[in-house]
Amino acid sequence: MVFSSAKREKNNMLAVNNLCIERNGRAIIQDLSFTLEGQKRLFVQGEIGSGKTTLLLALLGFVPVTKGEIKLFGKVCRKEKDFAPFRGTIGICFQNADDQLFGPTVLDDIAFGPLNQNVPREQAYHIAEQQLERLGITRLKDRMVHTLSGGEKNFTALAGVLAMQPKILLLDEPTNGLDRKNTEKLTALLRELSLPILISSHHHGFINELATEIISL
């Protein structure tokens, strides 16, 4: 079946057109264009300092855009206030999981998101239990967040994001702190998700296993 360009654009949850971002007069990102929809797993690869994290923050309205266009669910977003209504539908895991862990326990942390979405307490904790099981980290549920290893924090942060049922998932260097076994576990999990994912990474094996599309910065 062939869709018109208008139909394809409507199906894009995220569309970036000719995006340019500068800092202190230096170009960080130049003329970048891509779309995200369906179950696409789009990888952004590049060396440290190439702008991968900057791009993810720009997609949430946290970094100003010099030129170009960001569309979320068909709406052009230019100012910070334009992005605000969509942040509840976009899940992000930061490179440093400590930036988004609120604790005190792992179970409490994962339930925090649904509670913040006004989900009743009993249901929020049930959702948290489901995500613990889904990610295979039920054994951690009563652990204090600050006692976790780097890899355990990564999976806890991801469980917390998935508990809020995002429509788009953004992951910034998600294999940082993971050994080979847990990288394989993460790969299998992401492959099963039925939502579009944008992933920044310089882990070539991880990229090769998962990517449906790759862009380089």
Curated annotation (Swiss-Prot):
GO cellular component, one term: ATP-binding cassette (ABC) transporter complex
Binding site for ATP: G46, E47, I48, G49, S50, G51, K52, T53
Gene3D superfamilies per record: P-loop containing nucleotide triphosphate hydrolases
GO molecular function: ATP binding; ATP hydrolysis activity; ATPase-coupled transmembrane transporter activity
SMART domains: AAA (SM00382)
A Pfam family per the record: ABC_tran
Listed InterPro entries: AAA+_ATPase, ABC_transporter-like_ATP-bd, ABC_transpr_CbiO/EcfA_su, ECF_ABC_transporter_ATP-bd, P-loop_NTPase
Record keywords, A-Z: ATP-binding, Nucleotide-binding, Transport
Family the entry assigns: Belongs to the ABC transporter superfamily.
Protein name (database record): Uncharacterized ABC transporter ATP-binding protein HI_1618
